[in-house]
Every structure is written in C-alpha cells, then in structure tokens.
C-alpha cells in the first residue's frame, strides 16, 4: 500500500502514537507522519505509507492553517497551559481595536524566536531537555511567514480565537507569546487545532480512533494526488525518458508551459504518466524526486 491518509489526531496523544496505530491497521512498518503536532494539540496529520514516505519532506513544506485560542494577561514557561505560570497581569484595559491591530501586525515575513520548550537542538541537545533542567539558552530568531490571520473572535481578553495560515517552522505558541509581549500584558496559548495542511483539510480527515483497514483502503490518497499543491507541467515523452534516467535537460522544446527557475513542479509525460517532482535552474531541468509507479 502506497499513499497518504489524512488523519485527525486527538488531544492527549503524540504524533508517533498516530503512526503506531496506522502501522497496526495497515500491517506495515514503512509509515511516517508529516510534521509533529504537540500532544495537547489536535488536528490534521497526513500520514505517509510505503513509497509515499519519499514525499514526507515535500508535504511538510505545505502552508498550514491553525485554529488557535489565546488568553491575555498570563505567561507560562511553555507558552501554553502545560507549563508553570510565570506572571499574571490585568489585561482588562486592552481594547478590541488594540488587540486586532496587534494581531494583524504579525502578518507577513517576520523574525520569530522559537520557544525553549521545543524539539529544536542546540549542540546536539533538544531545547526542551535543557528547559526541564531549568536552563535557558539564547535562540536565534528564524524567518517565518504568516500569510494571513482570519476569523478573529474576541469573546473576552481571556478567550481570543483566530485562524492562522503560516509557513513551515512557525511556532504558534511563540506567536501568542509575542502578541502578549507587544500588548505589554503577556499571553498564553490555550488551545490549538491544525485545520489544514496544504490540500489536506479537517473536513476530509479520518479520526485516528475510527481508522479501520477498510477505511484506510477507501480513503488512501495517491502520491500524485497528495502533491496537488505543486503546479503541473507536461514534457514530451522523449525528454521524459531522459529525466527518468537522471539526466539534466537543457532544451526549451521540452515543455510548452512557462517554467520558472528554482520552483518545484509536478512533472508529467504527454502520455499522462506522472514522473515525479522536478526543478529548473540555469543549467537545465532535472527530476529532484523520481516517483513513477513501477
């Protein structure tokens, strides 16, 4: 079985727990998830089976959409409710307009400092392991992109909900913390749900608790379909043979569409055969990942 299954992870389980459950149902070992969701978070977690594990890195590049709840006036060491409360402040004077303006100021490409409680490594040691020892180290800010923040609901300063569309590597906990710091009252994430990962959406996900062999076979998505977020180009079959053999082709007759430099495309032969993912540079076009079904 080769393909991707759109799984909905419940709170209270790790992403590896989900993989283990899919392995049991599929009766196969070659299974991997496409981006960790913290145990206290829920939501869309595409899981790759068989040859589809080759495309895990590409699915991880997808834009993600998170539904997040945050509370103003409280800061914890983990930036969420799992941690120890470090400080509390009165946030009742903050107006809705101030909150909206602050939230919207984070849209765009920004520098974000990852939280101490994260799986990132420093000198070979995971940051959360240092944090548990009471050690805080300097973390370099990283460029991330917040594409949009929509559906902002301010029920009270204790409960703000919003949908955040962001790039790979974004820490929503850090976004909540940074919003609180900018408002000078602190903030903590209180709930997190991933509602979309590229073409994989919550409405089409199968709850991991409901997964059966029959459901898996019915809903598994082909490798080709799972890469729908990449633009498609078609090449002549003659050039397709060269690409299959790992040749970098420098010939503009190869494709009819306008092909940008350094952009990944889904590559098809003109007979409809899906070859894989390829990229063009100054020296020609080459398949980066051969994915043809043998």
From Swiss-Prot:
The keyword Transcription regulation does not apply. It catalyses: uridine(55) in tRNA = pseudouridine(55) in tRNA. The keyword Isomerase applies. Disulfide bonds: none annotated. Keywords: Isomerase, tRNA processing. Transmembrane segments: none annotated. Its EC number is 5.4.99.25. One of its GO terms (biological process) is mRNA pseudouridine synthesis. It is an enzyme of class 5 (isomerase). One of its GO terms (molecular function) is tRNA pseudouridine(55) synthase activity. The active site is at residue 38. Belongs to the pseudouridine synthase TruB family. Type 1 subfamily. Responsible for synthesis of pseudouridine from uracil-55 in the psi GC loop of transfer RNAs. This is tRNA pseudouridine synthase B. It comes from Clostridium perfringens (strain SM101 / Type A).
């Amino acid at each position: 079985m080769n393909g991707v299954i759109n799984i909905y992870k419940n709170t209270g389980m790790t992403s590896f727990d989900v993989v283990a459950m899919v392995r049991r149902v599929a009766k196969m070992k070659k299974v991997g998830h496409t981006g960790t969701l913290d145990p206290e978070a829920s939501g869309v977690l595409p899981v790759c089976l068989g040859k589809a594990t080759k495309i895990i890195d590409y699915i991880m590049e997808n834009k993600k959409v998170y539904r997040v709840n945050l509370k103003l006036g409280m800061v914890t060491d983990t930036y969420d409710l799992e941690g120890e409360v470090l400080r509390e402040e009165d946030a009742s004077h903050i107006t809705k307009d101030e909150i909206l303006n602050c939230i919207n100021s984070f849209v765009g490409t920004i520098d974000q400092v990852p939280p101490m409680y994260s799986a990132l490594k420093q000198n070979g040691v995971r940051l959360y392991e240092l944090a548990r020892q009471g050690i805080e180290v300097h973390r370099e800010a990283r460029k991330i992109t917040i594409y949009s923040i929509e559906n902002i609901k301010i029920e009270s300063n204790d409960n703000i909900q919003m949908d955040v569309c962001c790039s790979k590597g974004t820490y929503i906990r850090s976004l909540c913390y940074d919003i609180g710091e900018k408002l000078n009252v602190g903030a903590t994430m209180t709930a997190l749900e991933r509602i979309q990962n590229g073409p994989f959406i919550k409405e089409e996900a199968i709850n991991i608790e409901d997964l059966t062999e029959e459901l898996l076979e019915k809903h598994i998505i082909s490798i080709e379909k799972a890469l729908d977020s990449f633009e498609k180009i078609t090449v002549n079959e003659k050039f397709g043979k060269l690409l299959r053999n790992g040749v970098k082709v420098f010939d503009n007759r190869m494709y009819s569409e306008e092909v940008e430099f350094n952009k990944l495309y889904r590559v098809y032969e003109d007979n409809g055969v899906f070859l894989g993912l390829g990229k063009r540079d100054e020296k020609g076009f080459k398949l980066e990942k051969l994915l043809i079904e043998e």
